[in-house]
Amino acid sequence: MIHSSNYENQKKLGIPFFAVPNTLKHFVDPGHGWYRVSREMLFRMDLLDKISSFSYQKGNWVYLEEDVDASIFFTRYKELFGELQIRVTTNISENMSSIRYYQPFQMGMGSGCL
């Protein structure tokens, strides 16, 4: 069911209904975890200036650290789109994740800058 206020939020943000993420990848290593979200989606959700350098970036993807930055994302998602109806697929590594070697997040960096 599409709530009209949520639909209006999507229109204001320029996010087509089909572009709202409904599946996220969650990467976990023995010490931490990250959710992968496109930089464009963070931009459209007005979150780029709220993400810390504890998250990482590579190309058009931002890997939100699971403690604070991912919570900010999920709270905003619920504000804009209503109930959280996101499927999460988890990739668990027994070793240190390669994400730790990506560039720390910076708002003006990355190939997805808008």
Predicted regions span which residues?
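Short, flexible coil/linker segments at or flanking structured domains
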Residues: 23-25, 52, 61, 90
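Compositionally biased, intrinsically disordered low-complexity regions
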Residues: 16, 33-35, 110-114
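Short, compact, well-ordered microdomains
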Residues: 63-114
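Compositionally biased regions
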Residues: 5-6, 38, 98, 112
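Eukaryotic non-globular interaction segments with acidic/serine-rich, low-complexity composition
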Residues: 1-29
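Intrinsically disordered, low-complexity segments enriched in small/polar residues
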Residues: 5, 12, 25, 31, 33, 61, 106-110, ...
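A short, structured beta-strand/loop element
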Residues: 31-58
